[in-house]
């Protein structure tokens, strides 16, 4: 095609698509008996780009990663917790395989398998859920069970969880229905006693009842974007049977419930045996033997436990595991701070004894991996405050005494440019 302003007879030319004349546009491109202006070309490019954006996610979804691939990806970001990663990999693979096959296989209806993660604070429950969502490229949202109440009471309704998920994908219902919801602190909504409550328990058993249908699968009516400001708009209908719910909690004291059962010889299915005082199991070993009856005694109602058939237990992280977390994952904490210092043109070095001191401090605080950042941040605060105003600093070294608060980080200076040029 050629760029023409007038035809051979000198007539004024017009775009065949928008009808604008040659004087109203910058360029007019001619073809056999047809003309198109630069504005229409730009519009066509925009339409094509939008189409590509819509098609791309479908192409990405065509290849569902295998359990081995899911586990391998989790290994890149989460240290330890091997059993939990394997359980999650299989459960997530089966969930999305069920969605791809329309909930049925050869006429057999495939049930939904939501997941319950049990483990101490800072053991990696939230990180596992976030990493899974990132790998699968699906919308992800988190909810805190302690803020939820029954409908009609002050607090968050359970339907708000679905609204948050919709917000993460710009209110695209189809995308939201493939998402993952992580509900944290699920152990905090246990009822206060083994017996059904006589009075209203709006933040405990009542919330469990409210979550039942949502987790099992229902069509939730969610206000559209803008909510109450546009009451004339119809509610969005979201099918929660396609959403994967992962519930997590520390379940402090659950190990004692399990110990009481195991030590009386009532363990079922795990070959539990009576142990003497010298053979007391660790908390992690006890949690790995959890049974539905233990969760009922803890305060979860049987119907709620039934909606969470896949249970994965996480162990408390050891000192060695915390050191690995500091330096090995792709987004390890030390790598993050080194990248931050690199932006100032400065190298940051953590000596091995410093990493050990950070891990020891986190162990003493009993905050797990979650407490590592605050320890490193406190050690580097003064340096990060002063560094942008300092010149010629080439390297910052962190050793054990810095973590203990006994000394400042070691600053290594380079030669000034003038000295380097003169060879001094």
Swiss-Prot record:
Disulfide topology: none
Assembly and binders: Component of the ClpX-ClpP complex. Forms a hexameric ring that, in the presence of ATP, binds to fourteen ClpP subunits assembled into a disk-like structure with a central cavity, resembling the structure of eukaryotic proteasomes.
GO MF, any single term: ATP hydrolysis activity
Chain ranges passing through the membrane: none
Residue sites binding Zn(2+) per the record: 15, 18, 37, 40
SMART domains linked: AAA (SM00382), ClpB_D2-small (SM01086), zf-C4_ClpX (SM00994)
Family (UniProt): Belongs to the ClpX chaperone family.
Protein known as: ATP-dependent Clp protease ATP-binding subunit ClpX
Organism placement in taxonomy: Bacteria, Pseudomonadati, Pseudomonadota, Gammaproteobacteria, Enterobacterales
């Amino acid at each position: 095609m050629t760029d023409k302003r007038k035809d051979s007879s000198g007539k004024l030319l017009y775009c065949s698509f928008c009808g604008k004349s040659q004087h109203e546009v910058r360029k007019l491109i001619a073809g056999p008996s047809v003309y198109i202006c630069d504005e229409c070309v730009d519009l066509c490019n925009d339409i094509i780009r939008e189409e590509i954006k819509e098609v791309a996610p479908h192409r990405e979804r065509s290849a569902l990663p295998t359990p081995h691939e899911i586990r391998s990806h989790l290994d890149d970001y989460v240290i330890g917790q091997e059993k939990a990663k394997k359980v999650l990999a299989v459960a997530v693979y089966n969930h999305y395989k069920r969605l791809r096959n329309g909930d049925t296989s050869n006429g057999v209806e495939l049930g939904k398998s939501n997941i319950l993660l049990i483990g101490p604070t800072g053991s990696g429950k939230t990180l596992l859920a976030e990493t899974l969502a990132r790998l699968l490229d699906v919308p992800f949202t988190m909810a805190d069970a302690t803020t939820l109440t029954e409908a009609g009471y002050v607090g968050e309704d359970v339907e708000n969880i679905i609204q948050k998920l919709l917000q993460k994908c710009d209110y695209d219902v189809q995308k939201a229905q493939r998402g993952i919801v992580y509900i944290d602190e699920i152990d905090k909504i246990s009822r206060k006693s083994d017996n059904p409550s006589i009075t209203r328990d709006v933040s405990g058993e009542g919330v469990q009842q409210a979550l039942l249908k949502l987790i099992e699968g229902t069509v939730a009516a969610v206000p559209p974007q803008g909510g109450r400001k546009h009451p004339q708009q119809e509610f969005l209908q979201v099918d929660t049977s396609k959403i994967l719910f992962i519930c997590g909690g520390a379940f402090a004291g659950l190990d004692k419930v399990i110990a009481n059962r195991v030590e009386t010889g009532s363990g079922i299915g795990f070959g539990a045996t009576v142990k003497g005082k010298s053979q007391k199991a660790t908390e992690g070993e006890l949690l790995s033997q959890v049974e539905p009856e233990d969760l009922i005694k803890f305060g979860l109602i049987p119907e709620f436990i039934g909606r969470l058939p896949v249970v994965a237990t996480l162990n408390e992280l050891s000192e060695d595991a915390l050191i690995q977390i500091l330096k090995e994952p792709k987004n390890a904490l030390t790598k993050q701070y080194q990248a931050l210092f690199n932006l100032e043109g400065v190298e940051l070095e953590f000596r091995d004894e410093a990493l050990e001191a950070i891990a020891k401090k986190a162990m003493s605080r009993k905050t797990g991996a979650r407490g590592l950042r605050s320890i490193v941040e406190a050690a580097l605060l003064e340096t990060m405050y002063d560094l942008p105003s300092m010149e010629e600093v080439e390297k910052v070294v962190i050793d054990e005494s810095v973590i203990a608060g006994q000394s400042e980080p070691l600053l290594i200076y380079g030669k000034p440019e003038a000295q380097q040029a003169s060879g001094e």
